[in-house]
Amino acid sequence: MRKLIASLVHICLLMVTFTMLVCLPTLFVDGKDVGFYVKPFLSQIANVFSSILHPSQLKMTIGTQVRTIPDHVEVFAVQKREYPLFPVVIKPYVYSIGLIFGAFVVSVLLAVISSIGTAMLPRNIRIIIEGFVSILKTVPDVFFIFFMQLLVISVYRNIDFLVLNPISTEQNPSIVLPILILSFLPTISLFQLQLLLIREEQKQDYVTFARARGFSEMYILCKHIFRNVIVSVMNHVQYILLVLVTNLLIFEYLFHAKGILSIIMSGQDPAVIVYLLLLFIVPIYGVVLFLQWGKEKMYA
């Protein structure tokens, strides 16, 4: 019960923090005047809190292309229209959350499988793999996204077969390629971390004792070493999710994907921005709390 109350307090503090950050410009700017305006700032905060309590009344602005032909010239203009927040926001919200958690699961699975496999290899081969992975970690995320898009398009042009969808549209959203791209950097970081922890665990006395008992290296690694390693890895879950969120913002821009972050960055009403931020952050915060609970159970 105490932890539940603490979690609710954290969520309330998040809401207050988001609200103050979103309303901060009104503290210094009033129309075209620049100064220090406390009253409009507090009024904006009160309006945001009031609007959040009535989500059915929230409206979001969406820009749509409108085709016009003035003077026999075809012109496409962007026209902004207001729509109710629900159910319009549900599809981009589910898409972004699905990418985050899909990439998280993929990165954990790939890191676990690759680290166990690499730990079983001879030392010379393991050193080569670790060096190659260290080089991959220096590759910027934007470059990797462009490279994957160009690779998919090049394969399609040469063999006339579209392996993965390189561009996301509202009618045909790209799923597999974004998950692979988003999981790239977290997989490498987890892989390096797990290899380091495995090497440290292999120096422990219980590993020497298990080898003396005649247990195989695979059995010792999976049954004893990895159980201790996974507990330490759970301490880095927040970092992994933070990397995924920042990469998701870059991905939505480069893939022209209509996700929740692109909506937040498109200049919505302050109350809508705060509500969408909470809608996006709370599930991620819930996963962090769940993994912390699992870690405590493992220690117990």
Predicted regions and their residues:
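Transmembrane alpha-helices
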Residues: 9-17, 218-248
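Non-cytoplasmic
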Residues: 23-32, 235-265
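Transmembrane alpha-helix signature in integral membrane proteins
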Residues: 85-117, 233-239
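Membrane-cytosol interface at the C-terminal ends of specific transmembrane alpha-helices
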Residues: 168-211
